[in-house]
Swiss-Prot record:
InterPro entries reported for this sequence: Leucine_aapep/pepB, Macro_dom-like, Peptidase_M17_C, Peptidase_M17_leu_NH2_pept, Peptidase_M17_N
Pfam families: Peptidase_M17 (PF00883), Peptidase_M17_N (PF02789)
Purpose of the protein: Presumably involved in the processing and regular turnover of intracellular proteins. Catalyzes the removal of unsubstituted N-terminal amino acids from various peptides.
Gene designation per UniProt: pepA
Organism per entry: Pseudomonas paraeruginosa (strain DSM 24068 / PA7)
Protein name, UniProt field: Probable cytosol aminopeptidase
GO biological process assignments: proteolysis
UniProt-listed PANTHER family: CYTOSOL AMINOPEPTIDASE, LEUCINE AMINOPEPTIDASE-RELATED
Top-level taxonomic group: Bacteria
Principal localisation: cytoplasm
Active-site residues per Swiss-Prot or TrEMBL entry: K278, R352
Amino acid sequence: MEFLVKSVRPETLKTATLVLAVGEGRKLGASAKAVDDATGGAIGAVLKRGDLAGKVGQTLLLQNLPNLKAERVLLVGAGKERELGDRQYRKLASAVLSTLKGLAGADAVLALGDLAVKGRDAHAKARLLVETLADGLYVFDRYKSQKAEPLKLKKLTLLADKADSAAVEQGSKEAQAIANGMALTRDLGNLPPNVCHPTFLGEQAKALAKEFKGLKVEVHDEQKLRELGMGSFLAVAQGSEQPPRLIVLQYNGAKKDQAPHVLVGKGITFDTGGISLKPGLGMDEMKFDMCGAASVFGTFRAVLELQLPINLVGLLACAENMPSGGATRPGDIVTTMSGQTVEILNTDAEGRLVLCDALTYAERFKPQSVVDIATLTGACIVALGSNTSGLMGNNEALVRQLLKAGEFADDRAWQLPLFDEYQEQLDSPFADIANIGGPKAGTITAGCFLSRFAKKYHWAHLDIAGTAWISGGKDKGATGRPVPLLTQYLLERAK
């Protein structure tokens, strides 16, 4: 889809569809009023008949209005004045896209710039709008013999006042990069586990480096992990015929001596639970257990497209967790790259076992910050549901930066505590630490486990178990989150 920004009067534009907003009580904004005047009050007459109440997301398509070059006018409800928030604005945008998809027109003009969205300026409104539209165009039909019908719509133009046009252009540019990153994240997450395994992800990293010349990639194999002393990482993979991979992505968009930010992604390409086997019902969704790594891929793609002046490292800890005669047993003790020993009480708490070695590996980059992203605990879904990611960290300023980025990106997280009292739940009589802390506060104790391997830098942990994918039903699939949050965090660091 091509997105353009223009500063012209809406009633003068030749287009297949002109989109205008109407508030409750027949409220017309400046753009809708100008078009109404040009048509001799045709829009007002339709509204007077009561065909559109103006509630958020309601639509009404008008054909062949007089004195317009637009073939159609699509009216969309914007709700009550001064009550339009992010959620309602997204609903409005989705309703517009849904209608446009069903039309024969190849282009549309969106005259929505005069809509007031609470707490959002022209840049933020444009970004939210374009991101919603672009993400709404996503289709995954790679394995369907009956493909989706090609979309006739090819171009969307946003109208903006001349004073706002630069801000709208920038918002649109950022949104397109984020949406492209989300699409990559969703593609990787939606792929079946017989295709998307650790070796495949290594190949995808190299493919991304061919597409964007600023990206450097290293793929560490099983032998290299053994040389590095990553006993915990290797323990997760030893039950599978698929070999593990530690994928290292590096992008240097700033001065060489500037310390990088590091993103660490959990990449369990399929999680059976290992010997601590999961229930069979819903196990197919454990292909999404690599969505942390997929979100690092997607964030890198967004950063590379935007060419941000920042140094960034990605560490993707990729393995498959399977039961077999060679699999790790409950009670096994392994030595991590840090030298700490771990008693593995539950082989289904494997994400932290690959992440802990990746977090130790991150030390060599002397980073400004490290953020790990993982579908780590079902307890996070119990605590926060599927709307909000869990967030913990050892540096309050970093946590606040991530919370702020999530609020701006409408990809929110919520902070959970890492009090010392929780650490006691991880005590082991046989090793330095146990990999689970009992039934209580499971998300927090998982964060506590990781914190023991992140003491040499500012670190935060995002638990995306509830937000990385939609479970069951017709909308089942990866969401692309938290690419918007992470990209916004890096945009702010790049200023």
